[in-house]
From Swiss-Prot:
InterPro entries linked to this entry: NADH_UbQ_OxRdtase_chain4L/K, NUOK/Mnh_C1-like
Subcellular location as annotated: Plastid, Chloroplast thylakoid membrane
EC numbers on record: 7.1.1.-
Subunit composition and interactions: NDH is composed of at least 16 different subunits, 5 of which are encoded in the nucleus.
HAMAP family with a match to the protein in the record: NDH1_NuoK
Parts of the chain that traverse the membrane: 2-22, 32-52, 61-81
Membrane protein topology class: Multi-pass membrane protein
GO cellular component: chloroplast thylakoid membrane; NADH dehydrogenase complex
Catalytic reaction(s) noted: a plastoquinone + NADH + (n+1) H(+)(in) = a plastoquinol + NAD(+) + n H(+)(out); a plastoquinone + NADPH + (n+1) H(+)(in) = a plastoquinol + NADP(+) + n H(+)(out)
Xref: NCBIfam families: PRK05715.1-2 (NF004320)
Protein name: NAD(P)H-quinone oxidoreductase subunit 4L, chloroplastic
Pfam family, one: Oxidored_q2
Organism listed in the record: Hordeum vulgare (Barley)
């Protein structure tokens, strides 16, 4: 796959994630869009690592760290969403005003 195609795919995934993050009213959908943004960043890291320095694996190792961070973020985010849903009976963003009380 050519370098430009991979960059176009990464920008496309990033823009879909940003659009979904801005327009979503559901917290689960916002979390999925955030994961999509992180995956597009990983795609860029691996692509530029392969293009500029293919013998060293700095970009690939950093991408593995980002994947581990995304997994931890998803686990914590889903547990918080589960707690919010249990207490508020809704996962809509505009209905969760946890800082008012």
């Amino acid at each position: 796959m050519m370098f430009e195609h991979v960059l176009f795919l990464s920008v496309y995934l990033f823009s879909i994630g940003i659009y979904g993050l801005i327009t979503s009213r559901n917290m689960v959908r916002a979390l999925i869009c955030l994961e999509l943004i992180l995956n597009s960043i990983n795609l860029n890291l691996v692509t530029f690592s392969d293009l500029f320095d293919s013998r060293q694996l700095k970009g690939d190792i950093f991408a593995i760290f980002v994947i581990a961070l995304a997994a931890a973020e998803a686990a914590i985010g889903l547990s918080i969403l589960s707690s919010i849903h249990r207490n508020r009976k809704s996962t809509r963003i505009n209905q969760s005003n946890l800082l008012n009380n």
